[in-house]
Amino acid sequence: MADTEDDNSALASFFPDPPLFWKAFTPSNLQAYAEIKQQYASQHGIPVEDVVRVPDLPADSDLIYLQPPAEPKDGTWRLYGEPQSLEESLQPLESAGIERLGPPLPGSTTTSTSNTQTTTTDSQSTTQPTTDDTQPTSAFPSQQPTSQLPLPPSSTSAPGGASSGASSTQTHDTLHLHLKRLSKSLLLNFLELLGIMSLDPAAGSQKAADLRTLFLNFHHVLNEYRPHQAREQLIQLMQERLDQTRAETAANRAVAEKARRVLEGLGSVEIPAVDDVNIAGTGTGGGDGEAGYGSAAVPVPVPVGARTGTTVGDRRVGVDGEGAEEEEKMYWEREGMGWGVLDAEFA
């Protein structure tokens, strides 16, 4: 009995103590468990490292604490004394002894209380959410009670068990309206509490209990709204990602189209061939027998041995001799023409 009370106090403490099975991790138990794992691995023909759990250990042996616990068969377990479950489900308010002030979410297993209204006779106060068109004329319940109007009905069932009521959007619109009414009721009941406390501070406990019920219902309705909020947020994220992908695709296609036009423009540029050069013309560079320039605007090619320089691509850098300056000038004219086409396309 004393051990049970000690265990319960340890689980309920703010900082729980380490589990008591840490005492089972002794050198002798570790050695015995290693031998059992080795024997189990040799019997089943698997490596020892792959053995996670050895079944059929004696229940009264300390060796069962040296291996991880078995998976919960029913999907439930206890953690620090609190029950845990693999199924994420919202517990109904009725299971916690809290009165529900509005209709349950269609399809849920919770049931609303009769008339979904809570009225106190002592202070003539109410925790029923007020409607949008309710205009309270007095904050003091002893002078004028708050009017009570029914909440919007939940979806009704059609013959055959099918829901003839609202769709998912209408359902969550109803929750939105219910949240709005709860918030107005919270403000009204808070003002009533201030009025009661100003007249008789000892009589404010009932109104404080009403406020607690309203807050718990408000929080519960918010939790019922979470799945819808998660779906809407996921839809928004997917839509943003789709828009981003479409924008990137359009930008890539635009760049590809510009590159195609640039290549077409470069293909239309005419570059004079060497055969078109007037080798024997009369120009400024000399007389008979010398390489001069005629009407052609292209320099006369000079044998490579006649001048020095380094060939880079389709030109020579640092050349000297006859025609070197004109050849350099013509090269940069061709380069400028090509870059002009690029600038015009990407401007």
From Swiss-Prot:
<comment type="similarity">
    <text>Belongs to the Mediator complex subunit 7 family.</text>
</comment>
<feature type="compositionally biased region" description="Low complexity">
    <location>
        <begin position="302"/>
        <end position="312"/>
    </location>
</feature>
<dbReference type="InterPro" id="IPR044888">
    <property type="entry name" value="Mediatior_Med7_sf"/>
</dbReference>
<keyword id="KW-0539">Nucleus</keyword>
<dbReference type="GO" id="GO:0003712">
    <property type="term" value="F:transcription coregulator activity"/>
</dbReference>
<dbReference type="GO" id="GO:0006357">
    <property type="term" value="P:regulation of transcription by RNA polymerase II"/>
</dbReference>
<keyword id="KW-0804">Transcription</keyword>
<dbReference type="InterPro" id="IPR009244">
    <property type="entry name" value="Mediatior_Med7"/>
</dbReference>
<comment type="subunit">
    <text>Component of the Mediator complex.</text>
</comment>
<keyword id="KW-0805">Transcription regulation</keyword>
<dbReference type="GO" id="GO:0070847">
    <property type="term" value="C:core mediator complex"/>
</dbReference>
<feature type="compositionally biased region" description="Low complexity">
    <location>
        <begin position="108"/>
        <end position="171"/>
    </location>
</feature>
<dbReference type="Pfam" id="PF05983">
    <property type="entry name" value="Med7"/>
</dbReference>
<comment type="function">
    <text>Component of the Mediator complex, a coactivator involved in the regulated transcription of nearly all RNA polymerase II-dependent genes. Mediator functions as a bridge to convey information from gene-specific regulatory proteins to the basal RNA polymerase II transcription machinery. Mediator is recruited to promoters by direct interactions with regulatory proteins and serves as a scaffold for the assembly of a functional preinitiation complex with RNA polymerase II and the general transcription factors.</text>
</comment>
<feature type="region of interest" description="Disordered">
    <location>
        <begin position="97"/>
        <end position="172"/>
    </location>
</feature>
<dbReference type="InterPro" id="IPR037212">
    <property type="entry name" value="Med7/Med21-like"/>
</dbReference>
<protein>
    <recommendedName>
        <fullName>Mediator of RNA polymerase II transcription subunit 7</fullName>
    </recommendedName>
</protein>
<keyword id="KW-0010">Activator</keyword>
<dbReference type="GO" id="GO:0016592">
    <property type="term" value="C:mediator complex"/>
</dbReference>
<feature type="region of interest" description="Disordered">
    <location>
        <begin position="302"/>
        <end position="326"/>
    </location>
</feature>
